[in-house]
């Protein structure tokens, strides 16, 4: 199945990226005219992002197919280049809350489990940049299996940088457990306890699911917390059981939408900073396994409240 998928996606993406670069001058003219008519730089900037993505995709594919890549060096290179593209084309970046720990305060002797909010396409790149470049952690990221259709992510999974969850429940938890157990000092596992990107549809579905299963208290809590999805304990529990000595870094961010919630994938952010807050929870302060679920629920209540308080914060750059 893997070979068949790659036999389709790698040539397809390669031809598509080369085709985009070939018609770049024509697209630039069209984008420039559209920008003049609409008095907006968005068309040209959007084309800039598309062209930069094509170049990054081709370069990364060439590196991966050539072999001999180091997982951590490849990730650092990809994150640095992706962040540079976002900063130069869209003028977006990261603004770290002053209460967050500094890189020097992050423990290096033991592995780290990062529990991050998930809201908006592209936000994950900036979150990963903060962890991998600013905090200098060697990242391992848990993703949905659907993302293996993107050939760079698919091939990077062979390096051990990424873990694609093939199944739900027990099989997925075992994957997370095994990955966490393999972590060494200075390495971090990035998890998204909400299980997916925040959307209004997923939020409503989650509330209805909790109500229909008789978990009325959790349903009321989820209804009040309208900036986040209810966190799922399974992945976090699996990670902590695999790495019992790991500390936890809780990562919250405002997203790029003015209300801190969902943003349509085609609406590129411009001239904005992603406000991020991180909270370090040492391993000694983590609850026992039987208390993990209420701890995570309470933690996510704090996450939701922080987003609600800071969503309208001044993050627009003129």
Residue ranges and their predicted role:
Residues 1-112, 126:
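Membrane-anchoring hydrophobic helices of lipid-metabolizing enzymes
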Residues 56-81, 108-169:
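Catalytic core of membrane glycerolipid acyltransferases/transacylases, capturing the structured
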Residues 97, 162-167, 280-282:
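Short acidic-hydrophobic, aromatic-tinged amphipathic segments that line or gate anion-handling sites
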Residues 124, 176, 232-236:
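Conserved glycosyltransferase catalytic-site signature
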Residues 133, 137, 145-160, 184-290:
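A cross-family acyltransferase "interaction/gating" segment
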Residues 170-181:
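A Trp-anchored, charged/polar loop motif used as the substrate-binding/catalytic surface
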Residues 287-318:
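Accessory terminal regions of nucleic-acid processing enzymes
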